[in-house]
Amino acid sequence: MKKLMKTVLLTTTAFAMTGMVSCPKARADSGKTLNWSVQSDLETLDPQQCVDSTSGQMLNNTCEGLYRHGTNKLEKALAKSCKVSKDGLTWTFKLREDGRWSNGDKVTAGDFVYAFRRAVDPKTNDSNANLFGSIKNAGDIQKGKKKPNELGVSAPDNYTFVVHLSAKVPYFKSLLAGYPFAPVNRKAVEKYGKKYGTAAKYTVSNGPFVMKTWTGSQQRWNLEKNSHYWDRKHVRLDKVHVMVVKEASTGYNLYQTNKLDMVTLSNQQARNLKNNPEFVTREQGRMDYLSLNMNNEYLKNRNVRLALGYALNRKDMVNKVLGNGSETPLSGVPRDFMTYKGKDFANASHTKNATTYDRKKAQNLWNKGLKELGKSGQDVTLTLLGDDDDTTKALNEYIQSAWQTTLKNLTVNVQCMPKTQRIARMMKHDFDVVYTSWGADYNDASTYLNLQAKDSNYNFGQWDNDEYNKLFAASATTDAGNNQKRWNDMVKAEKMLLNDGGILPTLQPSNATMLKKRVRGLVYNPVGGYNWKGVYLK
């Protein structure tokens, strides 16, 4: 499940910012209504079109696939049972027969077949299509060499779903818990066409909740209990009222007046409230990093890229700028995310070029890089673009100061923009540098390494390295069944990426929040996010 979190863009061309959106009027409800806040707009309810964290959060609670993310574990959802062949290539799922769509239709194996084929169909333009790459023929379908109906999935009967893999995938079951692998209602998709998922009335769901009141543009909406959901007796909320709150001061005021049950805190608020009994900080299973556009006249130079990294004091970023429990990074993969034989992947793939702060080295590399480009002594101007929430603004200001005070002749201009505009520019590679945060789709380091693969839709900077691509491909194919070789492939590839300055890891974020004591049964998984299914209010 691709989760693009708070993101900052750097571009050499500034453009005007318009349409700053004000916070909607809040309304507090009691009883069985949970009042929740998010920091960015909802963009889609189509699991094959989602690229942002807010949409992902809503999809995690309105659609349901074979498995769900529980508290640090997977739970069966529509999968009643699973049988895997001895070679690990054929997965046969028996489905629950009481699964229902919000329109009353039965959820069948055919819905999964349709959804998987739709995801890999080039016409869908699904940014998450690469996640299906291990399924037989998926790659050829995405390249237009084969048809979607040749994908290695089938439905022998209404409640049997079979998946054929081209290579063993150690994390396949975890992958299936993500919303990209949820079924979709073919009748609804064909009825609404391109409108599907763009508003509540153009959406059909099969999860614990259904979306209500969202028209596709406003900054508050309701999720209501799905009366057709197979496990509705364990859904204790009647409604989740969600509002977009970008300013931390506004959010905390709403929280104090009981109009919100959960709010994300700014860095200063986190410091002031860390001893409050309602203060909660959570590791988010994601990594902040700078993606650099290799087509930029300056950033195509390795020494220039590394200079930008060495100029960042990551300890200051987590302690002085944020102060919310975030950690400095070791590599482009979070600490304690993946281990093998007692070794942590982040430690194993750590390189000095990735995370070290050294002003003198940054200056030397900067001067060397500009000389190699024939631009010594020339002024360099970059415009720093970022989301319009308080946390991103604070990070923008730090980066502006760090780069301007360390690197000679560099000017950094700062602008803020709504997340929807930023994502649109990022997906078109219309930037110089993107400060982005990637949330894990599944419990394996490949969810991060895949981002920089040549054919990945999320290789925003278009970094390309033949050896990296070969190593990553081997880890997913020829070496997939050999844990040691697979580990070595990925560690070597990650080091190669970092030593080349392909990305610049900035920090491993945590989320500092206030959560009302009346909220019980809330499940949080660093991979799957918040699960409201079992929440109740006391």
Predicted segments with their positions:
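Surface-exposed binding/hinge segments that line
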Residues: N128-K187
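N-terminal lobe/hinge region of extracytoplasmic solute-binding protein
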Residues: S37-K86, V204
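Ligand/substrate-recognition segments at binding pockets and active sites
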Residues: G216-Q218, R359, N367-A440, N511
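Aromatic- and charge-enriched surface segment that lines or borders ligand/interaction sites
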Residues: K80-L131, V162, Y298-K300
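Ligand-site clamp/hinge motif
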Residues: N226-R271
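Structural transition elements
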Residues: T328-G369, T391-K393
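Detector for C-terminal structural segments
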Residues: A311-K341, D390-Q400, M427-K538
